[in-house]
Regions:
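Twin-arginine (Tat) signal peptide motif
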Residues: 8, 12-14
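Extracytosolic ligand-binding ectodomains
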Residues: 2-4, 15-19, 31-428
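N-terminal signal peptide c-region/cleavage motif recognized by signal peptidases
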Residues: 25-28
Length: 428
């Protein structure tokens, strides 16, 4: 007997309602399978849509090594002491600049700093270790003998070596090497730059003062060659025998003797040959007759100075100061240029393979901008970097060599240093 809905017992109403809901929620088995099939087909597509896009190609990393000798810090105050990161800071800025341009060419650069310490591995052992671990470009801030030893040790590899510190003319002459590129100017370039300015000023009679070290003798020899080249005259030459007066901590009786040292001489300018900086700064303002002083101190020819601001150099000076917290020095600039040469050549050639870049460095199409007003390039006959040199005193840019009027059939830059007809280089 059917009961009216209103009179149906509560348990019965609950059972009927639950049965109705269960029937509505559970479709037949066929329909359930039909619903699951499209879902299974749609799952891969949904997963593909949510997957991350393919990663961009990873830039290839090129390693550039810097081998340098740690200089002992002075035991007492020395305003001119080389900073501990001299050269290294230039390399770091060069790597940063290479990576800035490398972002657009999928090239990446890293620096391997390899300081040489007392009792540690030598330059040759360090260079071989760098090449063995995949560092094909080596920048050397070392003396000439160590530079030559590294070049010879790596001659059977594809390594490209940059000399950033040794100015010795023999490395561009009898001891030149195919795998060795010179970014630091030779002594001949430095003395030619100074001689051009003296010729321009008609200061033709020179008093040459030579220090006791071998480097001083080599500088004096280069100066004599420049004097012959540009028609100057060494009217007097004397050795310096008064010790390191520029580093003395007070006046001494030697001062009177040094004053007499310059008496009775006929000259327009005194040229000091003191590459160690022991006494050259003592000479200015202490000559008997009022004469300018130049050479390794006083008026000098160099690659870089904090006083250089033209050709975008002020921007480089500011960037370096932010990076290193100090002023940029010539060695910093020379190491920076070495690193940038690699980056610039790789950008043009679209490869960082040293076997491809080494021949390109002496190609007429290669050049590198380096805040000098003109692009720099390598001389193919001795691997020396052509570059203008600035003639400066401590607080002012005086001139830039090559001077106007000194002409050359290829480029005025080849009026500085050893030209092709004069070279003794036979690349090995």
């Amino acid at each position: 007997m059917l009961l009216p809905a209103g009179r149906m017992p509560a348990p019965a109403r609950s059972f009927i309602l639950a049965l109705a809901l269960t029937g509505a929620a559970a479709p037949p088995a066929g329909a359930q399978a039909a619903q699951q099939a499209p879902a299974a087909q749609q799952a891969p597509a949904a997963q593909q849509d949510s997957a991350a896009p393919p990663a961009a190609p990873t830039p290839s990393e090129t390693r550039i090594g810097l081998i340098y000798r740690v200089q002992p810090q002075p035991s007492s105050y020395d305003a001119e002491a080389a900073p501990e990161d001299e050269g290294v800071a230039g390399a770091r800025m060069g790597i940063a600049d290479n990576n800035t341009t490398g972002r657009f060419t999928k090239q990446s650069y890293a620096l391997d700093e390899a300081p040489l310490t007392e009792g540690g591995p030598g330059a040759v052992e360090t260079a071989r270790a760098l090449v063995a671990k995949g560092t094909p470009y080596i920048v050397l801030a070392l003396p000439a003998d160590e530079v030559l030893a590294v070049a010879d040790a790596l001659k059977d590899t594809d390594a490209v070596i940059f000399n950033a510190a040794a100015p010795d003319d023999r490395l561009r002459g009898a001891d030149c090497r195919k795998n060795l590129f010179h970014v630091v100017p030779s002594r001949a370039m430095q003395t030619d730059a100074l001689a051009q300015y003296l010729t321009l000023m008609r200061w033709r009679k020179l008093f040459l003062i030579v220090g006791p070290n071998e480097a001083d003798r080599l500088y004096a020899e280069a100066l004599k060659n420049s004097a012959r080249k540009f028609g100057l005259k060494i009217s007097a030459e004397k050795p310096w025998t008064f010790g390191p007066l520029a580093k003395a901590r007070g006046d001494t009786p030697t001062r009177a003797e040094a004053m007499v040292f310059t008496r009775g001489l006929d000259y327009d300018m005194a040229i000091v040959a003191d590459e160690a900086g022991d006494w050259g700064d003592y000479v200015p303002y202490r000559t008997v007759d009022p004469r300018p002083v130049g050479g390794t101190q006083g008026l000098v020819a160099t690659t870089w100075s904090p006083v250089l601001e033209t050709w975008g150099a002020a921007q480089a000076q500011n960037r370096f100061r932010r990076l290193a917290g100090r002023l940029m020095r010539p060695l910093d600039y020379q190491v920076w240029t070495s690193v940038r040469i690699v980056g610039n050549a790789a950008t043009v050639r679209k490869t960082t393979d040293p076997a491809a870049l080494a021949p390109f460095l002496i190609d007429p199409d290669f050049n590198v901008p380096a805040y000098k007003g003109v692009s720099l390039s390598f001389r193919p006959w001795d691997r020396q970097l052509r570059q203008p040199l600035i003639v400066v005193q401590p607080k002012m840019l005086v001139s830039v060599a090559p001077e106007q009027g000194f002409l050359h059939q290829r480029t005025p830059l080849d009026t500085l240093g050893i030209d092709l007809p004069e070279t003794a280089c036979k690349l090995k």
